[in-house]
């Protein structure tokens, strides 16, 4: 199918919805889908030779539902199908028959190909720095003085003394003299100033043949 032969939904403006429920829930551009429960999108198509509709399922995004619609109309109408996306003609799988169950299964599989990454299952969301994190100090979820008492009771006096000693050693580190081996290497012949080191690097790139 050539791109010139593809019929897109955006090329055919929708008719005004008669009932209020369809006016408020249907998508302004995509065909065959409408909003349900505020954040879900449902999809269904009508068979060309019958008045019955084929239910294609509920999806978390409008794009996924629109892709399911394109799979169904490609199976039912072929080259005369009005698609929501131009690349659906070659990108989506086409059901091998017009059986509603087959169309529904292939449409659902095709829609999953376009599921956003942030909606995939199995993703672990790490807490932010400002979130409350349960460190396992107790089964309760209290806050304020109660949680502070649990945190303080989990540390003994020896732990505080060890932490205090470590902090004092870190504070005294910059005041201590460097080791003798380091001082012996710091002779006038091998000490570079910052400017000399800069020119040393520049000579590698400024050498002329």
UniProtKB/Swiss-Prot annotation:
Record's keyword terms, sorted: Activator, DNA-binding, Nucleus, Stress response, Transcription, Transcription regulation
GO biological process: glucosinolate metabolic process; regulation of gibberellin biosynthetic process; regulation of timing of transition from vegetative to reproductive phase; regulation of unidimensional cell growth; response to freezing; response to heat; response to water deprivation
Highest taxon of source: Eukaryota
Localization in the cell: Nucleus
InterPro entries: AP2/ERF_dom (IPR001471), AP2/ERF_dom_sf (IPR036955), DNA-bd_dom_sf (IPR016177), DRE1A-I (IPR045277)
Disordered, as annotated region: 137-157
DNA-binding stretch(es), residue numbering of this chain: 29-86
Family, per entry: Belongs to the AP2/ERF transcription factor family. ERF subfamily.
Protein name: Dehydration-responsive element-binding protein 1F
Lineage: Eukaryota, Viridiplantae, Streptophyta, Embryophyta, Tracheophyta
